[in-house]
Structures are given as structure tokens and as C-alpha cells.
């Protein structure tokens, strides 16, 4: 439910954050640590942050976030703004070379992407500390021919972030494949 607020007539820098409508499925469990907004607080010192996975040193994917800052004259103009996406989407699909059924010895797959920003500045959307690793699972298709994920959203990355595919086998072994992304 929207609540009305009243501001004195004047020019303000309006900060807009939001999530766009989705055309295709996205990762179902995104999370962010929200900024701690207080009356009289300095928004340039507030951040949206990654939330750590409690079981290890990785972080969860984030919401699909859009942002802009736009001056607006309250009292004489409608509030509206064109917003820009401040995250990147990633979809991974793993298949056999021959598009056949994946090996029954595979227990599961997980993706790790390194070099991801720890947080985004609330006022500028600038990324900070691009050293974190985000992880997410891949899911086996109903026909058993591929493992994939719904699109995950990530904060901006450093140049050439490291992509790591971790394949867990039913015999307890793990195989890891990695390469930098362009």
C-alpha cells in the first residue's frame, strides 16, 4: 500500500530504486542487506549489500535492481524517471556434448562467481569491494539432459571475474572447472 508524504515546495534530488517486471523466470531466492535509512541520515554513506551464505564463505544472488537520481521540483512537476539496471544477469546451462542424458553419477552442481561487489552505494549505485564470491545451485531438467538455473542477478564485478563450476559426484568426489569470464 502506498502512503502519502508531504514535502515543502522546492527542488529535491530524488533517489529511485526498484525491481523491473520479469519476462522470464529468475532465481527464486534473491536477498540483499538493506540500507539503514534514518531521519537526517547521510544516504551517501548507506549501502545495499550481499547476504552471506551461513554454511560457507560465499554470498547469495541479489534482486534485479534498477536505479537513478533525478532532480525534481516538488509542487510543480510529476515524479517520474527513467531507471538503469545496476546488476548483471547470469544464466548457466550444462549439457553433454551429444545433448544426451547427463551421467547418473552426478549428485549436483553449483556455480561460484568471484570478483563480485560486496555492496552498492545507496546514493550513487557505485560498487564497493569487488572481491566477494556469489554461489547458486544448478537444477537437473525433467528429461535429465541438462542442469541449469533461472537467471541470477549479481552486483557488478571486477574485470574478468572467475567462473567456477563445481560438480559433486555421488561417490563423494568433487570436480571443479574454472575460467575467467569476459
For the regions a protein language model found, what residue spans apply to each?
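A residue-level signal for beta-strand positions that form part of recognition/binding surfaces
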Residues: 78, 89, 108
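Short helix-to-loop capping/linker segments positioned immediately adjacent to catalytic or ligand/cofactor-binding
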Residues: 79-80, 99-102
Amino acid at each position: 500500500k502506498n502512503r502519502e508524504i508531504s514535502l515543502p515546495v522546492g527542488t529535491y534530488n530524488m533517489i529511485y530504486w526498484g525491481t523491473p517486471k520479469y519476462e522470464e523466470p529468475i532465481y527464486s531466492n534473491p536477498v540483499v542487506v538493506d540500507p539503514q535509512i534514518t531521519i537526517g541520515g547521510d544516504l551517501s554513506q548507506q549501502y545495499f549489500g550481499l547476504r552471506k551464505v551461513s554454511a560457507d564463505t560465499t554470498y547469495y544472488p541479489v534482486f534485479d535492481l534498477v536505479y537513478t537520481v533525478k532532480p525534481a521540483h516538488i509542487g510543480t512537476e510529476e515524479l517520474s524517471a527513467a531507471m538503469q539496471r545496476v546488476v548483471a544477469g547470469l544464466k548457466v546451462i550444462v549439457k553433454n556434448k551429444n545433448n544426451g542424458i547427463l551421467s547418473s553419477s552426478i549428485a549436483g552442481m553449483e556455480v561460484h562467481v568471484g570478483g563480485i561487489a560486496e555492496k552498492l552505494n545507496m546514493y550513487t549505485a557505485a560498487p564497493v569491494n569487488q572481491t566477494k564470491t556469489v554461489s547458486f545451485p544448478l537444477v537437473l531438467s525433467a528429461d535429465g539432459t541438462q542442469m541449469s538455473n533461472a537467471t541470477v542477478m549479481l552486483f557488478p564485478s571486477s574485470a574478468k571475474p572467475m567462473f567456477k563450476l563445481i560438480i559433486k559426484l555421488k561417490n563423494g568426489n568433487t570436480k571443479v572447472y574454472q575460467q575467467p569470464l569476459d
